[in-house]
Amino acid sequence: MSEKTTCPACKAEHDPVALKANLMVCPGCGHHFRMEPNDRIDYLADTGSFAEFCKNMKSLNPIDMDGYEEKLSEAAKKTNMSEAVITGTCTIEKMPVVLALMSFSFMGGSMGSVVGEKISRAMLKGLEEKCPVIIYATSGGARMQEGIFSLMQMAKTASAAAELDRAGIPLFLVLCDPTTGGVTASFAMLGDITIAEPGALIGFAGPRVVEGTIKQSLPEGFQRAEFQQEKGFVDLICARKDQRALFVKLLKAHAGVGAQNGGAK
């Protein structure tokens, strides 16, 4: 008998198989558990349409950080992924799109040189193919084990997003729990439409760090998706079960955008 999964919000216990079938959302209270990239692909993409690229790109140890290779190996075994993001092309209701989906399970979704490169290449693939790009972001920020090389990815990904913007190619961001640090401070806030999953933690420094710095208590719900929408940082909050339908509407509304006049706005 499989071990039950406890919802951190309502404390209800769920069968893991049933929970996965419900898109990792608690049927009782609607709490959104963290979801792995391959499960998102199965839900979003037309059956059999996803074609991964940059699959075998793996991180090195550019600053010879002790234990980094071991952490990468452990993360790869745990997630069956080579890095913290999967990139590929697919169709959604027969409409072409480039997908990049991050995994918090792989070293906290931290952005090192490979993650930054893959996300940048995904955006440039959209530029090349003149089709929209959808990025699911979830990350603790820059990967400290790569030092300055990880911070360089902030500029790289932001530059790729700017290329899409200049060409008029739609970039849709979905901010998942949590999206923080250097990812928030770069490409995650540069989408044409910024979507968040319910209850997702979205910010730069986490609430505990902020409280410790300002020596004050923070308001309830600080940095959650609903708070960020109220403050204007998020355009809309979309439950997981409604995301495919939302993207069908968005892709239809933006059909042909960026393909006219050689991709120029």
Task: Provide a role label for each language-model segment.
Residues A21-M24, V114, G182, M189:
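Charged, alpha-helix-enriched surfaces in structured cytosolic catalytic cores
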